[in-house]
Regions:
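Canonical Radical SAM [4Fe-4S] cluster-binding loop centered on the CxxxCxxC motif
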Residues: 1-24
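N-terminal pre-triad scaffold of radical SAM enzymes
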Residues: 1-7, 27, 31-35, 39-42, ...
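Aromatic/hydrophobic pocket-lining residues that form the small-molecule binding cavity
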Residues: 26, 59, 127, 159-162, ...
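Conserved SAM/AdoMet-binding glycine-rich loop
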Residues: 35-156, 167-168
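Radical SAM enzyme [4Fe-4S]-AdoMet core and its adjacent flexible, acidic
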Residues: 52-67, 71, 118, 181-212
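Hydrophobic, well-ordered secondary-structure elements that form the walls
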Residues: 105, 146, 166, 174, ...
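Internal alpha/beta loop-helix hairpins
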Residues: 173-180
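Terminal RNA-binding accessory module
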Residues: 189-282
Length: 282
């Protein structure tokens, strides 16, 4: 569940309030996964940042406990709210070698007026500060986000503010959504609903920006040695490559005579194999 009541979201009405899984229950599942050979786990939830508020626990403590499970070599976090990213939170995460420096911070808009109508509980300044804290504590972390275009009342000026803000933060990946009404939410009955054709136009602009920033982020790794957890084979131009991900969630492909399912290897990133996959020499 969720306690946030963003004006566009039906989840608090449909799924109720936050209900956290017991720490021991989570640890038991992680241990079962490790015993089955899994090396990476993702801690996720509808509103992950609120973990523990209903039972006297905290997300940081849960992460620290999962970090102690033998056999698990990577811990990836699901979507976070910027308010959880304090100096202490980031410093503690940076001490844990299993943490993947891949942080999905939901933004939704780069305009404070739009954020207020959305009932998001932070400002663009607070969000930017969270990104700065992460970049101070991790080397080239992957910061990804969600953005809604065409929210009721979003003017051309507000959209322009969002676009410039996104350029300044410089994300690895952005999930762009056109606002759609959810019956029963406050936003559904707001005035100044944005026409569909304008939403489509704004979405196209941000998708192009997202592709450009993503290419730039991935290109940073060319020539660098990285560790990849390989997952599965794929065919590219009639050749078989094994693909997997770095800790920053950059997709990598390598040619090899041996199967690499669930194998972790280091290699040097060479160049782009496709628009979204970089090849590696093992």
């Amino acid at each position: 569940g969720c306690n946030q009541f963003c004006s566009y979201c039906i989840i608090p009405y449909a799924r109720g309030r936050v209900r956290s899984r017991n720490v021991q229950n989570v640890l038991e599942e992680v241990k079962r996964l490790a015993a089955s050979g899994y090396q990476e786990v993702v801690l996720t939830g509808i509103h992950l940042s609120s973990y523990g508020i209903d039972c006297g626990e905290s997300l940081l403590h849960l992460i620290q406990m999962v970090h102690q499970v033998e056999g698990i070599r990577r811990i990836r976090l699901g979507s976070l709210e910027p308010r959880i990213v304090t100096e202490t939170f980031a410093e503690e995460l940076a001490k844990m070698e299993k943490i993947c420096p891949h942080f999905h911070l939901s933004l939704q808009s780069g305009c404070d007026a739009t954020l207020a109508r959305m009932n998001r509980k932070y400002t663009t300044e607070e969000y930017e500060n969270a990104c700065s804290i992460l970049r101070k504590n991790f080397t080239h972390p992957a910061i990804t986000t969600d953005v809604i275009v065409g929210f009721p009342g979003e003017t051309e000026e507000e959209f322009a503010q969002t676009k410039e803000y996104l350029k300044r933060i410089h994300f690895y990946e952005m999930h762009i959504f056109k606002y759609s009404r959810r019956q029963g939410t406050r936003a559904a009955v707001m005035e100044h609903q944005v026409p569909e054709e304008i939403k489509t136009k704004r979405s196209a602009q941000l998708l192009a920006l997202a592709e450009s920033m993503s290419r730039e982020f991935r290109a940073y790794y060319v020539g660098k040695e990285e560790e990849v957890l390989f997952e599965e084979p794929m065919e590219v131009d009639g050749e078989t490559w094994y693909t997997g991900y770095t800790k920053e969630y950059v997709k990598i492909a390598a040619k090899t005579a041996e199967p690499l399912d669930n194998v972790m290897k280091r290699g040097r990133v060479e160049a782009a194999l496709t628009d979204e996959i970089y090849r590696m020499k093992l």
